[in-house]
């Protein structure tokens, strides 16, 4: 082993790393480890400084932005293999000193993980130790995580078709609905409880989410007094255990001259909801069902319990508390109604991260799967078998409802672009094993003519990596329309739909190529600039196809000046009636229906405005 003195040279480590790539990983790690042992006279500060300088030097070399990004990853990997504890400091300092990103982004992305803030530097170091910077992994990372410094790499031409039997003739047709025998399913999503919501705090803040103790507007020249004659809803109100609304004492929010816009009792459009707004939304569901003598067979919740605040204000304790409080409130309000849930990208700590079970880092996240599974089983939403599976498989599960529908819940952090662990071995089709689980469940259901709903958080058309999206489309094509009866998402906070077509490219988006549709639910959180909303579906009892959706909302701005009274929740629209599409009454609102709607939205200003209104 060569012993170096003086300045620690990263190029030598990088050379060792490249050589080690030709041999088994352990040989490379041992070589690098031996090298560091031979330089034991060097302090951590010396090593850190040398790596920082090496990263900084890349900008002065005759290299493309892409090559610089790839080389940064390679340099980082050489350090992560032997001293992962130094990676966060090296990259945070480099990022701040060079102005690569904003200070907040540098710190949240590269600083070491702690329970006090949702920083991801330790996860970044884990990723570096596993990934191949010179191949698809590095190209993918530099495109998605580094603002397209590299061109988007070509998606690997991989198939999972060897995991299912050939598609029989009958599987190309959807079963015929019963006609008028239906039941109702509630769909709620994206609560994002803001535990530190403060009445009277800044609702017009300069950065990120507002209405917190730390919310500020950088321009201090304004005053909230202009709202004094307009807004009057500043009461410390609550709901009693029996559900009774209690309007509490009035808070004089206009004493604080530094506030531009004081946060009202029920929330604001630039904030996540206080618990009282979440309870109001759940109460509105219960009250409507009583008023209309409407019964729900079950509910689906498509994720996100934790707020959208900056990661430096998001800690482990509040993540756990948010998950426990929201599920407790759902159980208290919906009582015995089964609720089938998914984990959102905010429902983990650190934010958005999830590691594969079999590569050394999954223990960081097992606590969360155990907590979720415990809550779901304690509230009798899952049986023991399903909850045990969820504990060991990233909160994913399958369960059969009383009417015979199978529901498959998936953890979408598996394909999330902000999950560092999704960027190593990224050319492999199923490093988490979740697609294998999904396929096995679909094959089993197809064999016994059982219909299936798939629920998850992040739609594949938004924030998903390309290879998982490709494989998902392949799976949906194989098992539609015979087995997959419905696909449901959250995440966007908007009332949307996602049509899946056979083939690829814009030329494939024809009515003949329609495979299925994904229902994307609006959110209870008003962040950002949305009215709190929820929906329910009427579902055919025979086929479990969605026959209609009914959408409800409250005009949050009306609560700013209603003297602290409860929000008024209103019916907004029926998906079948609103778009006035020629469509048989006995046919479900399937992908073909939504293709017709999409064509109208694309070609008609009137329909485009209608869609925007909803």
Question: Where are the model-predicted features located?
Answer:
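Cleavable N-terminal signal peptides of Sec/SRP-targeted secreted and luminal proteins
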Residues: 4-22
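Metal-dependent phosphoesterase/phosphodiesterase active-site architecture
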Residues: 23-111, 116-291, 298-301, 362-409, ...
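Active-site neighborhood of phospho(di)ester-bond hydrolases with catalytic His/Asp-centered motifs
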Residues: 187-189, 265, 297-304, 335-345, ...
